[in-house]
Every structure is written in C-alpha cells, then in structure tokens.
Regions:
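Structural motif
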Residues: 44, 68-69, 140, 167-169, ...
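N-terminal membrane-anchoring alpha-helices
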Residues: 1-38
C-alpha cells in the first residue's frame, strides 16, 4: 500500500516537473477586417514569465523564422537569475526578430539598470508606457505599460497619439491592465501573462484563471500560461507555453 502510494506521488511529481519544462509553441490565427481582402500578414512571437528558464536552441527551432516581432510579456527574470542567463536569452530571441519588452513584477529583482543595458546591447525596445510603429507594418503600432506593482502604469502615455495607427498591439504583464484599457480603447490585439494559468490546477480548479486566446470581430486577446514557473518548478493542468499569432489583415 505504502509503495503504491509512494509510486503514485512520485509519478505525479515527475509529470508536473515535465509539464513545467515543455517547450510548447501554441499557434493562433487572427483575421482582421481589411478593405484589401487580407493581402498582408504579420507573425507575432509572444513569450511571458520566463523567470529562470533558458531560451535554448530546441525552442528556437520550433519558432517560425519569418516572425516579424518578438514580444516579451514581463517576468523575463527574477531574484537569483544571473545576468549572463538574461543576456543569453535576449540574444537568442533577438535572432528571430526585433524584440519589445515590458516589465513584470519580478524583473527588477535582477537589476533594473542591468536589464536596461542588456536590452540596449541587443537593440531591444523597452515599452515604458509608450508606443512605437512596428517595422515593416507601418499601419500597426505596439504599445505597452510598466507593471502595476511599481505604481508607474500610465495608460494615457502609452496610448498618446495612438490614432496614427490603424491597428495596435497592446501588451502589459498583468491582465487587469488590459481590462482598464478596454474601458476607453480597443486595441486590435492585447497580450498579457503573469497568472501562469494558475500553474497547478486540479481539473477546472486553480488559484488563477487558465490562459486562453479569444477573438471577437477581428480583435484578439491572449492571456498566456507563461513559459517558466515561480516558487516551485512544477505545473499541472496549465502547461508551459509561448505563442505565435499569425495576423492576416
């Protein structure tokens, strides 16, 4: 009886550890109404909550080499993650496409100025409550905010002159910021992470909502389970994931 219980527990823990280390690349499609009958396409690679994980060659091989933009949805790192690990991860992601990054609630534990220097070294852009045009897609802009834990979220600044774009990708680490934005602006695509999908779920039940992608009349919203873990390197019912969103417009 004891041996059976022990074997069962160890099997579950092994399953949870394996789930946390998976390199799942989840693919989504978003069709945006266009007078030109969808003659343009943009591919967005989105990854959030990397924490202590490596962006390695095995993951890179799974990602389409024609992605147009890489968006890191916060929690690139946390306390105890080496600067060399952070630098390597950004270097590897920057081989795919231009990198845009938003702060998560744990990132500054690894050193704010150090992260800024790494981003600058690889030509990556930090979205500090601001917006920029997306290279190769001049009618599209990307906007992002700081993390709410800093009390420096400025949605108004992040959307300043936003009407210069026909379409906007809006990213913030925490989903609650997306809900605030929706009260007075409707981006074409919204992205967030932070929740880890609850990380450990029993059936439908978890401490936080499981990640999902929703579309509605040419607009999309993605809340990711995230790629890494916090506290314990285990997952159940909310597997590690990153995303490629193919937008036809």
């Amino acid at each position: 009886m004891f041996r059976t219980a022990f074997f069962l527990i160890m099997s579950i823990i092994t399953l949870m550890f394996t789930s946390a280390k998976r390199r799942n690349v989840v693919r989504h499609k978003l069709n945006v109404p266009s007078p030109n009958s969808h003659n343009a396409r943009m591919k967005v690679f989105f990854i959030s909550d990397i924490h202590r994980r490596k962006i390695d060659r095995k993951l890179l091989k799974k990602i389409d080499m024609d992605v147009d933009i890489v968006i890191i949805g916060g929690d690139l790192a946390e306390r105890g993650v080496s600067l060399s690990r952070i630098s390597t991860n950004i270097r590897n992601l920057s081989t795919l496409a231009p990198v845009y990054y938003i702060w998560g609630n744990n990132d500054r534990e690894a050193g704010e100025q150090e992260i800024r220097l790494i981003m600058s070294r690889y030509g990556s852009v930090i979205l500090d409550n601001e917006n920029f045009p997306i290279p190769g897609h001049p009618t599209w802009g990307i906007s992002g905010t700081d993390d709410p834990t800093t009390e420096r979220v400025d949605i108004g600044a992040s959307l300043q002159n936003i009407n210069q774009y026909n379409h906007v990708i809006f990213a913030s680490h925490q989903p609650r910021v997306l809900r605030e934005v929706e009260c007075f602006y409707r981006p074409t695509l919204m992205l967030a992470g932070h929740t880890h999908g609850g990380q450990i779920r029993i059936g439908k039940f978890g401490l936080l909502e499981k990640g999902k992608f929703q579309t509605n009349f040419g607009r999309g919203k993605l809340i990711s389970n995230g790629y890494g873990t916090s506290t314990v390197p285990l997952r159940l019912g909310a597997p590690a994931e990153c995303h490629i969103i193919t937008i036809d417009y």
